[in-house]
Amino acid sequence: MLDMLFTIRIGVSVLAFIIAALSGIALIPYLKKINFGQTILDIGPSWHKEKQGTPIMGGFMFIIASLVASAVGYTVYRLFYFDVENSLAANGMLKLISCMVFSILFSAIGFADDYIKAVKKQNLGLRAWQKMVFQFLICVAFLVALYFLGDKSTEINLMFISFDIGIFYYPLMVLVMIYISNAVNLTDGVDGLCGSVTVVTMLALTTICMIIKEYEVSMYAIAIAGGCLGFLVWNLHPAKCFMGDTGSMYLGGSFVAISLITHNHLLMVLIGLVYILEALSVVIQVSYFKFTAWRHFKKTGEKGKGKRIFKMSPIHHHFEMCGFSEYKIVITFSLVALVTGVISIVLQYNV
C-alpha cells in the first residue's frame, strides 16, 4: 500500500513539474504582452535595475500545476486505493481542500498587490495594513476550519515537550502564520531563491506528512515541490519571469497551512528556518536602525543618522553586497533548508 502511495506521489510531482514548465511557454509572452513587468525600486541592489520589466505573476505556473496535479493524484488515490472503512487520514480530503483554499486566498492578496504595481503603476502595491487585515481574517478562518475538522488541541508541540496554552493558542498561531507567510514573501528577492528553498521545504513536509499518515495533504506538498521545480526552468538566473507576490504568498500560505496540519511547531520552525531568518534580518535591521537613529537624535538633535547591522536586508541582499553571486546564494540557502529539513524528518521519525 505504501509503495503504491509513494508511486502516486512521484506521479503527482512529475505531472506538476510538466504543467508548470510547459505553461511558461504561453504565460511569459502573455505577461509581456499585457505589460505585467517588475518595477525595481531604488532601495535594492543597483545591479537589479537590469531586471526592470521582467514579467511578474509567474507564480501562476506552480499554482495551477500544484492544484491540478493534487486533484488528479487524489482522484487516482480515491478511485483505486482508498479504503472507506479504514481511511488513512481522518478528514483527509477536507484538510486537503482547506489547505488549498487557504493558499489560494493568500495568493489572491498577492495578486491584488501585483496588479496594483503592474497596472496602477504604484510601486508599493497594497498598503501594509490592508495586507495584514486580509491575512488575519484568512488565518482565523483556517483555524476555525481545522477546529471543526477535529483539530481542537491548544498545545504547543516542541517534539519532546508540549504545553497547553489554552485560548491563547489561537492568537499566537495567527501571528506565527502571518509572520512565516510574509517571511516566504521576503525570500523572493534573488532569481530562483524562493522556488529552490520551497522545493526542499515541501519535500520535507511531504515526508513528515507521510510519517504521520496525513497522506492526502502530503500529495499537495509534493505537488507544490514539483510545480516549483517546473517554475525554476524559467526563474533561475537570469530569470525570464518572477513569481511575484501572487506566487510567494501562495507558497507562504501553503507552507504554514501544511505545517499546522502536522501540529508540530518545532518542525515548522526548523523546516522554515531560512524563511524565518530572512524576515528576522529585516526586523533586526529596521529595529537597530531606528534605535540608533533615536539615540543619535537624543544626543545631537540630528535626524536619520541610524546605523545598520547588515549591508542590506533581507539577508540575501547582504550576501549579494558581500560579493556572493545569485547562484551561490541559492545553493547556500537551499543547502541550509536541506539540512534543517533532514533534521526535522529524523526527529519526527524517532518520536
PLM-predicted stretches and their roles:
Residues 126-151:
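Internal, non-catalytic "lid/hinge" segments that mediate substrate recognition, gating
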Residues 28-45:
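Membrane-interface loops
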Residues 119-127, 156-163:
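Membrane interface segments of multi-pass transport proteins and intramembrane proteases
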Residues 37, 116-118:
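Membrane-helix interface/capping segments
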Residues 1-32, 63-111, 115, 142, ...:
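Alpha-helical transmembrane segments
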Residues 41-55, 121-134:
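Juxtamembrane helix-capping/reentrant segments at transmembrane boundaries
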